[in-house]
Curated annotation (Swiss-Prot):
Oligomer and partners: Heterodimer of HisH and HisF.
Gene Ontology terms describing biological process: L-histidine biosynthetic process
Residue positions of the active site: D12, D131
Gene: hisF
Entry's localization field: Cytoplasm
PANTHER family to which the protein is assigned, alphabetical: IMIDAZOLE GLYCEROL PHOSPHATE SYNTHASE HISHF, IMIDAZOLE GLYCEROL PHOSPHATE SYNTHASE SUBUNIT HISF/H IGP SYNTHASE SUBUNIT HISF/H
Disulfides per UniProt: none
Function: IGPS catalyzes the conversion of PRFAR and glutamine to IGP, AICAR and glutamate. The HisF subunit catalyzes the cyclization activity that produces IGP and AICAR from PRFAR using the ammonia provided by the HisH subunit.
An MF annotation (GO) of this entry: imidazoleglycerol-phosphate synthase activity
Stated name of the protein: Imidazole glycerol phosphate synthase subunit HisF
Amino acid sequence: MALAKRIIPCLDVDAGRVVKGVNFVGIRDAGDPVEVAKRYNQQGADEITFLDITASVEDRGTTVEMVERIAGEVFIPLTVGGGIRTCDDIRTMLNAGADKVSINTAAVTHPEFVHEAAERFGSQCIVVAIDAKRVSAEGETPRWEIFTHGGRTPTGLDAVEWARKMVDLGAGELLLTSMDRDGTKAGFDIGVTRAIADAVSVPVIASGGVGDLDHLVAGVKEGGADAVLAASIFHFGEYTIPDAKRYMAEHGIEMRL
């Protein structure tokens, strides 16, 4: 039997509130993180991802107390990201109740950190977040580049090559966000999702751009993603997690219903 695909609602947290922006700016309030997480746990989400979206930009660690509160209320895997720069940061988050940590900016500035983290804590709890933006012109061979600091800083790194390198260093999972699609509701960037899913042996989580349930199906069927991450469509009540799971199952995708 194929492994069930996962639906992961994402809590982008800024100043203690769940928010949602378009292309990482233009913020809209979506509620209290603990309450939002509880709702998704009750609805049957497979996992929850908590991203402290100001952590890397403003240079501060993720809110440990909030992670503890969420972990105390949800009984599904919790991934925490934002400002994770050292093994001490990882230990702090795992002790607070996170099951996995997501490393983004620090993976670029210090790739060996990914190796060190995987050696110390195990690949199964190390997620590398890849924020990719298309840099090729229309008609050219598609090419995507890695951006850091919440999508503000270009790195010159090729996204597909970078994904391979991160897996070689020990990443157990990749959280791939299309910066071009984030918040647009235009659907995942299937091109980069498929390119990275085909290039690596670990699960790829597709993120950025979900506007309807067909986009979730496409992420798995066309993009080759193992999991799909979304925020707005769930936060603002357009769809519930059970709606999404049923729809994906009806389209022939193995789901935990």
